[in-house]
A protein has these predicted regions:
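An active-site-proximal structural segment forming one wall of the substrate-binding cleft
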Residues: 275, 281-282, 305, 309-326, ...
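The substrate-binding groove and active-site-proximal loops of carbohydrate-active enzymes
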Residues: 301-309, 357-372, 409-422, 460-475, ...
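C-terminal beta-strand-rich structural cap/linker in extracellular carbohydrate-active enzymes
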Residues: 713-741
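Carbohydrate-binding surface patches
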Residues: 651-691
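Catalytic-core region of carbohydrate-active enzymes that cleave or remodel glycosidic bonds
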Residues: 483-486, 490-493, 511-514, 520-631, ...
Length: 741
């Protein structure tokens, strides 16, 4: 619907009210503006009859539109016209790309540059600047980082996971092969109320097999061991032996075992299967006797997980993440955390405890969350790789884009009812107790200890909200949560939110709330073009250093047509990260998004790392993140760049960042060149202290559309040294102080 603008009669004083429909029959939203450019936060005050009676039709630019026609003062029209002109100019800058460099830099010769360090201006910067953001999108968890090989192991898939898809049900990924046996789903007497569905096999004559296809198959590696487990019972009390096989597409048995189900009650049965071949297989469970069998939580897990953890993570994927050296991990997601509607808000308590007692739910990205990868596993992974955990919880409201658009209160659906907010806030406080509480003295500390981790996880950060519409509904609930955390856990660093963009109403109102409450940190998000990042390297230079609130750039990425990841996008991000290091006194954390994507199951591009069942495929941008993560510092050494070319188009495409790691004493020089020609650079490190003459150099370079790997070698350095910065390149030079090994 075209929004109608109801303009007050006192044009220079009154706000203009923009009103729009939430559905076809009643309910509406409103926002106000003095100039039709800057708007207040949205409100959903009451229901109203249909707008058709107050609208008129008009032909605008050759097309019929519906709305109101109002007489306004010229200053308002003039302001709109000037704003349009400014946006057109800004969009032209944001549209700059290397594809235009042939024309833009026709005849450009190699540039000479001097990079001079200014150690007297050194400043401390965040020691947790570069991290990772894990969201369960693109099959990142089940079928991805979570090492479980059986899909729909709990028979809890439901059509509601995928917008009513009838084929997405409790039998998805399962099939019965053979005759004289039936396969049905029951809920009469489950293992746990949170896991109500289970399989029932009625065997009239042995020979049939219950099969599971896994996630695009089950990939085995020769000689590796796999833990098979199953909850089962024989209601009639007659024992039944199960043959368990892993079979490839040609019918070859690549691994097998057997076990006997003998209990009338639910019981766990376990066995180990050793792979006879490297193959893509499926699971077969073949009962050897007649009678009824009940089966649930059918699991196949590689023993060779990351750090050898039970119920752990896929080793190669987890290692690629660990190699970034992320100083923190944000989880379990952004949109996943605040959910698609009130009923879909992520509840952390449903993800801890025994696997059979965890409560699965719909993933708003169109599939299922088993919760096998739950809060315990997230915290454990953070600990395993030395990263700070940063859990994100809903701020009492779901995503404003929730599918229930017909709700009269908008996508936020009025938020969690006030009668329930006390319990919801207690859940958040319980999370902090679960993470940090004494294993013997606190209720939730004991729960953590019972899961195998008696020592506290030492949680320091907690995110409240994600990209939320900053409405009165949000503000009221966020404030309640924030004040409760501040009162009970004053040392906790709460990370708030300022909407989904780096400008606009939610950004402005979100920052107002941060200033009002004194929120320690806010989470900014923006996915932008190469030209935006190129022309906004000073975005945080202008930040008010007197503010108490720090910035977490929680989601960002460079987007180009086709959403590809290549040298163009990677170098753009390298250039911007140099600016973020420069502003590391106010930008406390950063994380690229999204992190993982399974080939054939993506809902978003680009992603940092793609994978399938056998391969991990880091993008070019991954290596930029890795180079910054492995070469981080906690002291920023300002530098001055002097060029022999005064063209601003040249200047803004060359960047340098010099940091020192106090733990090692190493000085790290990062140089970025987004020009199509070499930059002959003299690096002057006078004043930083004695250094070794040999340094490690890593270079990532190629044509804009290329996807190369970085090349590492050594180079000679001195207090002053020359270096030819290749066209379209990112170079990291790590220099040790003298007398260090």
């Amino acid at each position: 619907e075209i929004a109608q603008c109801l303009v007050g009669s006192e044009m220079c004083i009154r706000d203009r009210i923009c009103t729009w429909k939430l559905n076809d029959h009643d309910g509406y939203g409103q926002a106000t503006s003095k100039d039709l450019i800057n708007w207040t936060s949205q409100k959903y005050p009451r229901t109203t009859p249909d707008f058709d009676g107050v609208r008129v039709k008009a032909i605008v630019a050759g097309e019929e539109q519906k709305g109101n026609i109002n007489r306004v003062v010229w200053t308002l029209v003039d302001g709109l016209d000037k704003n349009y002109g400014w946006n057109q100019y800004r969009n032209s800058l944001h549209g700059e790309r290397p594809i235009q460099d042939g024309e833009r830099f026709a005849g450009l010769k190699p540039v000479k540059a001097t990079v001079t360090v200014q150690p007297e201006g050194a400043k401390a910067i965040s020691d947790v600047l570069l991290g990772a953001f894990f969201e369960d999108i693109n099959y990142s968890a089940d079928g991805g980082l979570y090492a479980e090989l059986i899909q729909n192991r709990d028979f809890e898939y439901a059509p509601s996971d995928r917008e009513g898809d009838k084929n997405w049900n409790s039998t998805h990924s399962w099939a019965l092969k053979g005759e004289k046996t039936t396969f049905t789903i029951d809920t009469t007497d489950p293992i746990h109320i949170n896991n109500p569905h289970y399989a029932v096999l009625n065997v009239e004559q042995p020979g049939a097999a219950l099969e599971n296809t896994g996630f695009d198959g089950i990939a085995l590696n020769t000689g590796e061991k796999y833990d098979f487990s199953i909850f089962a019972r024989v209601p009639q009390g007659k024992s039944n032996k199960l043959q368990v096989r892993l079979v490839d597409g040609k019918g070859n048995v690549c691994g097998e075992t057997s076990l006997t189900v003998s209990s009338r009650q639910w019981k766990t049965y376990k066995a180990v299967i050793t792979a006879k071949a490297t193959a893509d297989t499926h699971l077969e469970i073949i009962p050897q006797s007649v009678g009824e069998l009940n089966l649930d939580m059918i699991s196949l897990f590689p023993q060779n997980t990351f750090k050898g953890r039970k119920n752990g993570l896929r080793k190669d994927l987890a290692q690629v993440l660990a190699d970034i050296h992320p100083r923190f991990i944000r989880f379990p997601g952004g949109c996943v955390a605040h959910g698609d509607g009130l009923k879909n808000i992520y509840q952390w308590k449903n993800t801890v405890g025994p696997l059979e007692a965890r409560k699965a739910q719909r993933n708003l990205w169109g599939y299922h969350q088993s919760m096998g990868l739950g809060y315990f596993e997230y915290f454990q992974f953070c600990e395993d790789i030395g990263a700070e955990p940063l859990p994100v919880l809903a701020a009492g409201v779901p995503c404003q884009n929730s599918a229930c658009h017909g709700d009269l209160r908008g996508g936020q659906q009025g938020g969690i009812p006030m009668s329930e907010m006390g319990a919801y806030i207690q859940d958040i406080l319980d999370l902090i107790e679960w993470a940090n509480g004494d294993a013997k003295k606190t209720k939730w500390g004991k729960v953590r200890a019972e899961a195998g981790h008696p020592k506290p996880f030492n949680l320091k950060y907690i995110g409240i909200g994600n990209e939320d519409l900053i409405t009165d509904i949000f503000e009221e609930r966020f404030t309640m949560i924030f004040n409760a955390i501040k009162e009970k856990y004053p040392e906790m660093i709460v990370v708030g939110t300022v909407g989904p963009f780096n400008e606009g109403t939610d950004y402005v109102e979100g920052w107002k709330l941060a200033d009002k409450l004194g929120i320690p940190m806010v989470d900014e998000h923006y996915y932008q073009t190469p030209g935006w990042f190129l022309n906004n390297q000073d975005f945080y230079d202008k930040y008010d250093r007197s503010k108490k609130t720090k910035v977490y750039l929680g989601e960002y990425a460079t987007h180009i047509p086709g959403r590809k990841a290549n040298i163009e996008t990677a170098l753009t991000e390298a250039l911007y990260l140099a600016a973020l290091e420069r502003n590391g006194d106010v930008v406390h954390m950063t994380s690229y998004a999204p992190l993982l994507a399974k080939e054939g199951h993506t809902q978003w591009n680009p992603d940092l790392i793609y994978f399938n069942n056998r391969e991990v495929k880091p993008t070019t941008g991954y290596y930029v993140q890795k180079l910054y993560g492995q070469n981080a510092g906690n002291e920023y050494l300002p530098s001055k760049i002097t060029l022999d070319n005064r063209d601003d188009q040249v200047r803004k495409r060359i960047a340098a960042s010099i940091v020192r790691d106090s733990a090692s004493g190493d000085v790290i020089v990062k140089l970025v060149n987004l020009l199509p020609v070499e930059v002959n650079t003299n690096v002057d490190l006078s004043g930083i202290g004695a250094i070794q003459s040999s340094a490690k150099r890593t270079v990532l370079t190629g044509k804009p559309a290329d996807t190369p790997l970085p090349v590492e070698d050594t180079m000679e350095v001195a207090e002053k040294f020359d270096y030819q910065l290749p066209a379209y390149s990112f170079t990291v030079i790590r220099i040790k102080k003298a007398n260090e090994k």
